[in-house]
Amino acid sequence: MAVTYQTEGVKMPDIKKRETTEWIKNVAASYGKRLGEIAYIFCSDEKILEVNRQYLQHDYYTDIITFDYCQGDRLSGDLFISLDTIRTNAEQFGAAYDDELHRVIIHGILHLCGINDKGPGEREIMEEAENKALAMR
């Protein structure tokens, strides 16, 4: 099990890696999952747009892109997070930057746990799962 935190073209956000990893592990366990190899790549809006275009053929900015490499109950994936979008969203929603960052960090894990947010009613289910996970910090 390894959770890594990397940057591409941005400064590493001020997160407590050990505590964050333990929190991620606990959230995964609450869904009956174990951590495999999880890589967080913090980047800029321009980088996430490039990844979105290249791998998903989507031509828009987003806060997170999750590449799922899970096997059975073991969560594995690459999670690209745009710190620019995190900042914009925090301002737009009146949220603290750190809270929005943690929301997006766990959002990717929840996707790996099988929770979707694109279909009817799924956004509300995801938001409820995010809030429950954030309360576990």
Curated annotation (Swiss-Prot):
Cofactor: record remark: Binds 1 zinc ion.
Keywords attached to this entry: Cytoplasm, Endonuclease, Hydrolase, Metal-binding, Nuclease, Ribosome biogenesis, rRNA processing, Zinc
InterPro entries for this protein: MetalPrtase_cat_dom_sf_prd, YbeY
UniProt keyword tRNA processing present: no
Annotated EC: 3.1.-.-
Keyword Zinc: yes
UniProt-annotated location(s): Cytoplasm
Cofactor(s) essential for the protein: Zn(2+)
Family: Belongs to the endoribonuclease YbeY family.
Protein name (Swiss-Prot/TrEMBL): Endoribonuclease YbeY
Taxonomic placement: Bacteria, Pseudomonadati, Bacteroidota, Bacteroidia, Bacteroidales
Gene symbol of the encoding locus: ybeY
